[in-house]
Amino acid sequence: MKRLEKMEVSEKRIKVSEKRSPKIFLSGSIRGGRQLLGTYRFMFDTLEEAGAEVLSWHVADPELEKTEMRMTEEEIYARDMGLLLKSDALIAEVTVPSTGVGYEICRALVQRIPVLCLYSPDASVSAMVLGNPDHLLDARAYPDKASLKKIITEFILAL
């Protein structure tokens, strides 16, 4: 009997110590403008440092346009929606208005996936984001990269 008890305790320790990396869908403007590519890359790096697995790494890829030129609209949609459905959370940079980012946010909320929207304090962010009462959506302004890193890290650790 004692051996069985030890085995159960040891299995519990393994489960606690094997906390898996959260899977994150990173969302940012692509066709709406790539002027924040450096910010997307910073967000990607911050997520990896925090122990997250970024499923939509292509958002931070400077060669994305070349890659997506070889894909149909349907292939891009299927890839992105497939990755979103595998995600534990969505983190979106919403400073640059983007129909695609808005669509991804909405789909995540419909699927009950937590969403963190980040934006520059001087951005004109849609009321559909800032006024959304869904408790799974958190919208936060970041004045600098240190604040951006802190907000992302705290969000990941809370998942």
From Swiss-Prot:
Coiled-coil residues? none
Query: Which SUPFAM superfamilies does the record cross-reference, listed alphabetically?
Result: N-(deoxy)ribosyltransferase-like
* Enzyme Commission number(s): 3.2.2.-
Report which reactions are catalysed by this protein.
a pyrimidine 2'-deoxyribonucleoside 5'-phosphate + H2O = a pyrimidine nucleobase + 2-deoxy-D-ribose 5-phosphate; a purine 2'-deoxyribonucleoside 5'-phosphate + H2O = a purine nucleobase + 2-deoxy-D-ribose 5-phosphate
Which terms are listed as keywords in the entry?
Glycosidase, Hydrolase, Nucleotide metabolism
Top-rank EC class of the record's enzyme: hydrolase
Superkingdom classification of source: Archaea
According to its UniProt entry, the protein's GO biological process terms are: deoxyribonucleoside monophosphate catabolic process; nucleoside metabolic process; nucleotide metabolic process
Say yes or no: keyword Hydrolase present: yes
The record's note on quaternary structure and interaction partners says:
Monomer and homodimer.
Record protein name field: Putative 2'-deoxynucleoside 5'-phosphate N-hydrolase 1
Q: Which organism is it from?
A: Methanosarcina barkeri (strain Fusaro / DSM 804)
State the organism's lineage. Archaea, Methanobacteriati, Methanobacteriota, Stenosarchaea group, Methanomicrobia
